Regions:
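Glycine-rich phosphate-binding "P-loop"
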Residues: 8-14
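Metal-dependent phosphoester-hydrolase catalytic domains
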Residues: 15-38, 43-141
Length: 141
């Protein structure tokens, strides 16, 4: 099955990010709706932003989070390297065309431990990135 994966890392400037996503949507529309497309990445725009709304209101792409039959998302995706940070803000997204169904969606919150200096048997939790990874189990219809 032919498929297209588009990765994005949007700017922090809200006007530019909305415009860049409109350009991406135009390119996807040029494919004529015939090819399955997955658009994923760090959009630096949460689920309430103009950028996000531009994408989901286009009816070209849907949010895997919203489509998932089973969802594991105890926090948002941006953690600022703080393992104790909790948020509902998702700035990392997986969008897909109607060629796909989403079985499961998850925000993976695994941390690792490092020894605390000058303290025996003491460890500190760390995040490997300032964003938690997002994963989806999808099926081509």
């Amino acid at each position: 099955n032919p498929d297209t994966l588009v990765l994005s890392h949007s700017t922090l400037k809200s006007v530019m990010e909305a415009n860049s996503e409109e350009i991406v949507l135009q390119k996807i529309k040029k494919l004529g709706g015939k090819l399955p497309v997955i658009l994923t990445g760090d959009f630096n725009a949460d689920q309430n932003s103009r950028c996000y709304m531009t994408i989901v209101n286009s009816k070209v792409l849907a949010d895997a989070y919203e489509c998932a039959g089973i969802r594991y998302a105890v926090t948002g995706t941006f953690n600022a390297f703080d393992p104790n940070r909790k948020t509902t803000t998702r700035i990392d997204h997986i969008f897909l065309t109607s060629h796909f169904s989403v079985d499961r969606y998850g925000i993976l919150t695994d941390t690792y431990r490092i020894p605390v200096k000058n303290m025996e048997n003491a460890f500190q939790a760390r995040n490997p990135s300032d964003h938690f990874p997002v994963v989806a189990i999808i099926e081509y219809k």
